[in-house]
Amino acid sequence: MRAILLLGAVLALAVPTVSAGTPGTSLTITAWSVGGRTMHTYRLTCAPAGVRGPVAGTLRPADACAALREIGARIYLPALSEHLKGCNYIQAPPRASIVGTRNGRRVRTAVQVGGCERPLVPVRLLRRVVRFPAAAVRA
């Protein structure tokens, strides 16, 4: 009976080391403020999904890693914002670049928040009121 309990304890200890061998998520996030005036760099490392506790030597901010899991693959798409024709920024919007690995696969993407996703004035009205150079109208 003791041998079975000892074997069970050894197997229970071996399971986390097996899942700890799978790659986790390691991202370097560089964020710029409005107008690109200030820049901040953050490094985020998450343990693999199968690991319940922090892995030795791994910084694991639980809330940020949980948010990344909730958002899922959507955040790793090539770009999250769309640019509309006839829309110009007065100042550059807040933006971020995300570079690193997700579950062992390379990640490189850029995100812009705000800006021209929803223009306040329809582009047709904007073209009537504002005179664009000829090259900008054709674009």
Enumerate the predicted regions with their spans.
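N- and C-terminal low-complexity/disordered segments
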Residues: R2-A139
